[in-house]
Amino acid sequence: MTSKLEQLKQFTTVVADTGDLDAITRLKPVDATTNPSLLLKAAAIPGYADLLKQVKSDAKGNVDLACDKFAVAVGAGILKVIPGRISTEVDARLSFDEPALLSKARQLIELYQAAGIPKDRVLIKLASTWEGIRAAEQLEKEGIQTNLTLLFSFAQAQACADAGVFLISPFVGRIYDWYKKSTGQEYVGANDPGVQSVTRIYNYYKANGYNTVVMGASFRNIGQIEQLAGCDRLTISPELLQQLSDDQGELPQVLKPGDAGEAKQVLSESQFRWAMNEDAMGTEKLAEGIRQFARDQEKLEKLMADKA
């Protein structure tokens, strides 16, 4: 019997949610995703010490540029060992500033191109705010493909699809966390609210012919992953990838394109904002996620400034 990881790869593109080059080399994902929190972890890995020194030297005291250069250097290193794409995140503090998001995204692509990496191997990650979705819509028109992250609500998924973004990252585990804390209940299998959210989005996209890729993210256990087997892509931590690799049990496909989905609805800005207002979980987790990424970005900047 093959491992659950190998079985999963038969019907889902497996992505590594890490900046750890050793883990990526060992687990052989197609793509990889990073974010400010993962870059902060990567900065603490001894193997990245020389790279940290180099980017700080190249940035000549510009801490913002040093952080961008570090993100791109980590991404470029990962691209040497995967066949697919790297997702690199825009500073979360810009999440409500469309012009600033556009400027930063273009700058990251320019840094990748300067490192010899074509833009078709990079996805720019943006938080799924209204402004982030609008920025993504413009970037897609410019040939810069995007990954809309911190996605917790159905309204966010609807707006992303209408904007023609390349990929969304709905967060399974954080939705589960919210409901578990809110209700005091334990959720398993198909009853998991995070699993239900991604399943609903996947079925809606397929039923309405959207090309936007659904990439489930933020998993707490392999049970959540098993329930979403068949999703376009799943981005998974090295720890859970290893558990799947070590498990020789059967893993059937659960999500399939033919399953019924809801009718298409195009949301205006006011409808989007109202839907978010009515979704306590989505609103709270989006705000919390932006705050956390912003704090880790600030920690990374401090690291760049301290060692400059």
From Swiss-Prot:
Active site, per annotation: K125 (schiff-base intermediate with substrate)
**What's the catalysed reaction?**
D-sedoheptulose 7-phosphate + D-glyceraldehyde 3-phosphate = D-erythrose 4-phosphate + beta-D-fructose 6-phosphate
One GO molecular function term of this record is:
transaldolase activity
| Keyword presence, Plastid | no
Q: In which pathway does it act?
A: Carbohydrate degradation; pentose phosphate pathway; D-glyceraldehyde 3-phosphate and beta-D-fructose 6-phosphate from D-ribose 5-phosphate and D-xylulose 5-phosphate (non-oxidative stage): step 2/3
**What CDD domains does this protein map onto?**
Transaldolase_TalAB
Q: Which GO terms describe its cellular component?
A: cytosol
Which keywords annotate this record?
A: Cytoplasm, Pentose shunt, Schiff base, Transferase
**Localization, UniProt:** Cytoplasm
Keyword match Cytoplasm? yes
What EC designation does it have? Answer: 2.2.1.2
Gene Ontology biological-process entries: carbohydrate metabolic process; pentose-phosphate shunt
Provide the top EC class.
transferase
Binding partners and assembly: Homodimer.
What is this protein's function per UniProt?
Answer: Transaldolase is important for the balance of metabolites in the pentose-phosphate pathway.
Write out the similarity annotation.
Belongs to the transaldolase family. Type 1 subfamily.
The UniProt entry, under PANTHER family, shows: TRANSALDOLASE
Name of this chain's protein: Transaldolase
Species annotation: Pseudomonas putida (strain W619)
Phylogenetic placement of the source organism: Bacteria, Pseudomonadati, Pseudomonadota, Gammaproteobacteria, Pseudomonadales
Query: What is the primary gene name for this protein?
Result: tal
